[in-house]
Structure formats: structure tokens, C-alpha cells
């Protein structure tokens, strides 16, 4: 079949980090996607961190200063106003121990630190004759300074020595330990083989950023600790973006996984700086999706799985205009099978989507798109792993049983169809692949796509989500790092975080 006239390509090529030069001594704000799985403070899969390394190396090898921004998980987040109040409260508590005052705070500092502070004061000439030793007159000299000067000197000292002087300041406003990016900074340093500086508060990092030298890398704390990152109010998002934009000269986005967000860091910063380029990872994502949604080698098939038809309606509706084959698996397949009159036992079914399923099958037939549904199933009476699950003879599922994976006949048929195609895009697992007895279908698809890619040049794309986890080790052309972003592209939507970047000339 040919692509329908109204099946427009919703993504275009963008200027990349390779087009941005010189980067020497430039402060490069790089939005990355370090939203990695964590368990008990440990990273369980560092794929997204490793995927950003080439772009980071490009910046530092060119003598640039790399300042990384990312989110992690879904923290509650606080407003910037509340965050500023919290920071001021903590500064106040740090400066006035039990209301003893500035001189009392100064008095408990190490002698070397006292000398450094006095060297910046109006009494610096007198201070040159004072040693760091105990009882040499440092505190007495500080006590004679005007109150405003004391405050200014201590504020400067606190800003420059947060970690050591103010342990209570070494966490962000809105901080939630399980969502902190600190473990990511540690892993990134291991992968880069160099120190990675870590700013405890993304909106209070001006001093730390100003100290960075050529070739340095800094990771800012989770941008979602502030609610303005994904806030609905455009002015509030812009206010946050302005602070972050002030840290840098150049904006590069390598966060395809967050490209569907109209957020402070994805769209706000490049709008303020007036430019934006794609990192190598983003460039690769754009390139592959532009091909498969534009003029891919044919035949083109879409393999769609997952739990719910309702979550894939727009994808199915959009892709039917572009593809030659549609293979459906996962729990969503049972809604389509029931719509065709088959028995599905206790399997999941969205009754409200039966009419959509019938309509899609009819439209696909009219467009000469071949829709292939499971012809056998791996079943059990309960949603749990068992050593010997039931394998059905045909499409029908016995009463009292639920299908949890595609069966061996279906696997064979799907693998044969993959063998006919020159392009394939896959989104969603074929079964409950987290349970070993129901993982064969998903991993068989991954293996078939990998084999086709390596042996005959199949252009294969895994469109993010759980299927990406199953296929990472397979030899696929491209495993997308974007779950929601790739899904929205396949639904025919424009990604704000891509659209805002400069077009390739």
C-alpha cells in the first residue's frame, strides 16, 4: 500500500551538536533524560545515562563546560516561591544559632576560614597581621565590623561553602531522597572517568556554575523538585526557565524521552536563549522516526502490544494510514478477538472499545492493511506464573482461563511476517513478559527483529516502553529512549521539545 495523502510526517531534522561550534569555554546547558530505574538508592539500569555520553564528550572534548539538567521520577515538587522561603529559612537558621548572632557564628569557624573572610573585609589591612592560630584576635576584629558588612561577608562565605559550612543547605527545596540525582552523578563520573560536580538545588546553583572550568561537567539536582518545570502556567514555567537559562550560553537537548513535555527545561530555556540544537541521541531518535514516518523501505509493519486498546487508539488510528501489516499482541488483542466473535474466557477486554476494534479492522481492510491477531495463546486460570500453562489449539480461550502471552503458532506467524518486511516498528509487549512462562512471545519478537536487522538490513525501531526493555540486548536498528514521546510521535502528534529546536539547514 502507499501512504495516505493526509498521513503527514510530524517530525523534521534538526540542527545537531555537531553543527554548533566553537564550544570552547562556552557554558552548554544540556537537557538529558536520566530518568533511570532506581531501587534502594541504586541504579538498576543505566542505559539512559550511557546513551547521553557521546554528546557530553563532544562538549567537553571541544573545551566546553557541560551543565546537565534532568528529571527523575515524579516528586511532589514545590513552587519557586515556597522554595525561596525554604532557602531563606535555612540560611537564617544556619546564621543565627539560637539567636547568638553573626559574631557567634563567625567564632566557631576554623581559623583558616576566619582569615579568608577577614581578608575580604574593610579591616583586611589589620587582618594581614593576624594568624590562623587560636586567640589571635580574629573574632574581636570581626565583631567591630558594621552589621551590614558582617552579614554580607557571611552570606558570601555560606554561598561558597554550602557543603561544609551548611550541611542543612545541601539539599534542594522540594527534596525527596528517592528522587535525588546524586546517585546518577556518581555513576556518570564512573562512565566518563572524571569528576562530575553536583549542584544540590537547580535554581540556586549560580555560584557553583561560575566556578566551572573548561572540560568540567556538572549535574543539577532534579528539576522536578520545582513544580514550575511541568506547571500549567506558562509565565511560571518561563520564570523558572529564565533562572536556568542564565547559567548557560548554548542549549542542547538530548532528552527525547521528555520531548513530549512543554516544560521549563524542554521548551522554556531554548525560547529564552533564542536557539536550540539536538544532541547525538536526540538526533538519532529524530532521524529514525523521520524515516519510518516519512518514506520507509516497504513493506512496513507495526507490532503493537500492551494492556489496553484505549492507550493505543490514536497510535492505531494514525499508523493504519502508513503501514502494510499490523500485528497485535498483549492484552489489547483480546478486545479485537472478542470483537470478531471469539471466546476470550477471563482475559482482559475493554467492552467500551469493541466498536472501535470493529471499525479499525474494517478501515484497515479498506486500506488493504493486513491485520494479524493471535491464533493461539498461553493461558492460566490465575494471574501468576506456573510451570505448565495451558496452550490453546486456536483463537478461542477456554472458560475460566485468561491469556497471558501469545502462543507458539502465533509466534511462528509473527516471525514469518517480520521476515517479509523491510521496516518494522514495535510498541508494547506481547504478554506478561515479567513472568518467565509468559515472556516467550515478547522475546521472540525481539530476536526476530534483531536477526532481520543484522542479516538483511531490516530497519527496526523499538518505540520505547516495556518493549524497549525486552529488546535492549537484541540487535535492533534503534531502541528508542522515549516511552511517552515515541508513542505520541506514532500517534501523529508534534513533540514540543523537538519542534522548538533549530531546523537543519
UniProtKB/Swiss-Prot annotation:
Keywords: ATP-binding, Glycolysis, Kinase, Magnesium, Metal-binding, Nucleotide-binding, Transferase. InterPro entries: Pgk_euglenozoa, Phosphoglycerate_kinase, Phosphoglycerate_kinase_CS, Phosphoglycerate_kinase_N, Phosphoglycerate_kinase_sf. GO terms for molecular function: ADP binding; ATP binding; metal ion binding; phosphoglycerate kinase activity. GO terms for cellular component: cytosol. PROSITE patterns: PGLYCERATE_KINASE. (2R)-3-phosphoglycerate binds at residues 32-35, 48, 70-71, 73-74, 224, 260-261, 308. GO terms for biological process: gluconeogenesis; glycolytic process. CDP binds at residues 306, 311, 330, 428, 433. ADP binds at residues 306-307, 312, 330, 403, 427, 433-434, 466-467. Its EC number is 2.7.2.3. Pfam families: PGK. ATP binds at residues 307, 312, 331, 403, 434, 466-467. SUPFAM superfamilies: Phosphoglycerate kinase. It catalyses: (2R)-3-phosphoglycerate + ATP = (2R)-3-phospho-glyceroyl phosphate + ADP. It comes from the Eukaryota. AMP binds at residues 307-308, 312, 331, 403, 434. It is an enzyme of class 2 (transferase). Pathway: Carbohydrate degradation; glycolysis; pyruvate from D-glyceraldehyde 3-phosphate: step 2/5. Mg(2+) binds at residues 307, 311, 466. Gene3D superfamilies: Phosphoglycerate kinase, N-terminal domain (3.40.50.1260). Belongs to the phosphoglycerate kinase family. In T.brucei, three genes code for phosphoglycerate kinase isozymes, which are transported to different cell compartments. Monomer. This is Phosphoglycerate kinase A. It comes from Trypanosoma brucei brucei.
Amino acid at each position: 500500500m502507499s501512504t495516505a495523502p493526509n498521513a503527514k510526517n510530524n517530525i523534521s531534522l534538526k540542527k545537531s551538536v555537531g553543527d554548533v561550534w566553537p564550544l570552547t569555554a562556552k557554558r552548554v546547558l544540556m537537557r538529558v533524560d536520566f530518568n533511570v530505574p532506581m531501587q534502594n538508592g541504586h541504579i538498576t539500569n543505566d542505559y539512559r545515562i550511557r546513551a547521553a555520553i557521546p554528546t557530553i564528550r563532544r562538549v567537553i572534548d571541544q573545551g566546553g563546560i557541560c551543565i546537565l539538567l534532568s528529571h527523575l521520577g515524579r516528586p511532589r515538587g514545590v513552587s519557586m516561591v515556597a522554595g525561596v522561603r525554604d532557602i531563606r529559612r535555612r540560611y537564617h537558621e544556619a546564621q543565627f544559632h539560637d539567636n547568638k548572632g553573626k559574631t557567634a557564628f563567625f567564632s566557631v569557624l576554623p581559623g583558616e576560614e576566619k582569615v579568608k573572610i577577614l581578608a575580604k573585609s574593610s579591616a583586611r589591612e589589620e587582618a594581614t597581621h593576624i594568624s590562623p592560630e587560636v586567640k589571635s584576635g580574629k573574632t574581636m576584629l570581626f565583631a567591630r565590623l558594621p552589621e551590614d558588612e558582617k552579614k554580607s561577608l557571611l552570606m558570601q562565605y555560606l554561598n561558597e561553602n554550602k557543603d561544609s559550612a551548611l550541611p542543612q543547605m545541601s539539599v534542594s527545596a522540594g527534596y525527596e531522597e528517592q528522587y535525588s540525582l546524586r546517585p546518577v552523578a556518581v555513576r556518570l563520573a564512573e562512565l566518563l572517568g572524571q569528576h562530575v560536580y553536583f549542584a544540590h538545588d537547580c535554581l540556586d546553583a549560580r555560584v557553583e556554575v561560575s566556578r566551572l572550568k573548561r572540560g568540567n561537567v556538572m549535574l543539577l539536582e532534579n528539576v522536578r523538585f520545582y513544580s514550575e518545570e511541568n506547571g500549567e502556567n506558562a509565565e511560571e514555567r518561563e520564570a523558572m526557565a529564565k533562572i536556568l537559562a542564565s547559567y548557560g550560553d548554548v542549549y542542547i537537548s538530548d532528552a527525547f524521552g521528555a520531548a513530549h513535555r512543554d516544560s521549563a527545561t524542554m521548551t522554556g530555556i531554548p525560547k529564552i536563549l533564542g536557539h536550540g540544537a539536538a544532541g547525538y541521541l536526540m538526533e538519532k531518535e529524530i532521524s529514525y522516526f523521520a524515516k519510518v514516518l516519512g518514506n520507509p523501505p516497504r513493506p512496513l509493519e507495526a507490532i503493537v502490544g500492551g494492556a489496553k486498546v484505549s492507550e493505543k487508539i490514536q497510535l492505531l488510528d494514525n499508523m493504519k494510514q502508513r503501514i502494510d501489516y499490523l500485528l497485535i499482541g498483549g492484552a489489547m488483542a483480546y478486545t479485537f478477538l472478542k470483537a470478531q466473535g471469539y471466546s476470550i474466557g477471563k482475559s482482559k477486554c475493554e467492552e467500551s472499545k469493541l466498536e472501535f476494534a470493529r471499525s479499525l479492522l474494517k478501515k484497515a481492510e479498506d486500506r488493504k492493511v493486513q491485520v494479524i491477531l493471535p491464533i493461539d495463546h498461553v493461558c492460566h486460570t490465575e494471574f501468576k506464573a506456573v510451570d505448565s500453562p495451558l496452550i490453546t489449539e486456536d483463537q478461542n480461550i477456554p472458560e475460566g482461563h485468561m491469556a497471558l502471552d501469545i502462543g507458539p503458532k502465533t509466534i511462528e506467524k509473527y516471525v514469518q511476517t517480520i521476515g517479509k518486511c523491510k521496516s518494522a516498528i514495535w510498541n508494547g509487549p506481547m504478554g506478561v513478559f515479567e513472568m518467565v512462562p509468559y515472556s516467550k512471545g515478547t522475546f521472540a519478537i525481539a530476536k526476530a527483529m534483531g536477526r532481520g536487522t543484522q542479516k538483511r538490513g531490516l530497519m527496526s525501531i523499538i518505540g520505547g516502553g516495556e518493549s524497549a526493555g525486552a529488546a535492549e540486548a537484541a540487535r535492533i536498528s534503534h531502541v528508542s529512549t522515549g516511552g511517552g514521546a515515541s508513542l505520541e510521535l506514532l500517534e501523529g502528534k508534534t513533540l514540543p521539545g523537538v519542534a522548538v529546536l533549530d531546523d537543519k539547514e
